[in-house]
Structure formats: C-alpha cells, structure tokens
Amino acid sequence: MGYWGYFTVAESASPLGGLACTRAIPGLTLNRRLSGNWQVWEHPAEPDIEADDLALALAEETGKPALVGFVMDSDCVVIEAADSSNGAWTACLSPKAMASYLAEDGQRLEDFMLTPEQAAEHAVIWATLTGNQVEVAPLADIFQKEADPFAEDLFFTLLRGMSLA
C-alpha cells in the first residue's frame, strides 16, 4: 500500500499551518522548506476540505500562488493550483493511473483534468506569478510521466520544474 495524503505548497513568512485557512486541518505538518519563504506542508490522509478550496484560500490569504497535491496510493497526484487573479486549475501527475481510478467510477480523465499540455501552460503562468521563468516543454513531460515508482516523487519533480526547489 502506498501513500495517501496532501502536500500543500505556498509562500509565507509565517508557518502555513498557522494561517487562518489551515488552522482547522488537524495533523498538518511541515514537510520541507523550499527556496525563499516557500514551504511544503503535509497531511497524511484526506483532510475535510476540498483541495481547490484550500489552494484558493491559501492564495487569497498569502497573496501568492498556492498549490495542493493529493497523492493517491503513491500511484498518481491530483494537482490543484490557484492564484488570486486567475482562480484555480486542476491537473494530474501520472495520468494513466489517474484514468484507471476514474474509470472505476465510470468517469473520464478529460472530464476533470487539463491535458498535460494545458497543465504545462497553466503551470508556466503560475510559476511566472511566483517570479520564476520556466519552459512549457519540460513541464509537459512531467505531466505526461507515470509514477516510477512513487507519484509523490513526480510531485517534487514538478516543484523543481517550476523552479521552487
């Protein structure tokens, strides 16, 4: 059995776990600090909050872009990213694995997630809002990759691809 849980990424001089939008999430702990004031916090199970709501709330409270990744059994990751100007967007890492999860409920990947190319375009804009200049092609490659072996590794590869780590 793999990892199930959330990674929450935002920039703040204060600990993310102490912000108004995260205080009510029990078990939220610091996973790592990235460059500048960027932080990754982790919740090892599904919190009682929607990821897009959390990403938007973090973006609004910090005034900076925010990103939430929900890891599903180390197979795939739902990415919810937001900024206060453009709202939220949803994509995934390890799309074949995600499609399998959705198919179990009779759903299709394209009904919920951006394509890897669309996700990469959104990620470039998101990264630009963080002050980083990144290229579409390497990000599209990350969004197309399958977990090998752990999807959470792809999540941190995405953060590096957006010049956060």
Question: Where does each model-flagged region fall?
Answer:
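Generic alpha-helix signal with a bias toward terminal, lower-confidence helices
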Residues: A20-T22, F70, Y101
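Short, extreme N-terminal segment that most often corresponds to the first beta-strand
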Residues: M1-S35
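Long, compositionally biased intrinsically disordered terminal regions
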Residues: A97-A165
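Short, intrinsically disordered low-complexity segments
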Residues: I25-A97
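Residue-identity detector for threonine
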Residues: T8, T22, T29, T62, ...
